[in-house]
Amino acid sequence: METHEARIKRMRMRSWRRGTKEMDLILGPYADAYIARMDEDALNVYDALLEENDQDLLAMILGQQEMLPQFSKLLAEIEEFSRGRLAKG
């Protein structure tokens, strides 16, 4: 059984080491900022999101593909976080 700390560590690592650099730069900072504060339900959704294909996720975030219903709220939060982060830079 994976401990909570091990799960967070695994999910952060998977957020930074995706299949594409674009998704590394989107999910990595988001995970650093929010994953430690997520409740169990939010962690389950984020963990499932990490199983999705990077090209599909990027297309959903960019509005080029319809968001999967189970991820729509989370992807909207990630998109807002990323846009805010880039606006500061």
Name these PLM-found stretches:
Residues 2-89:
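Positively charged, polar, low-complexity stretches
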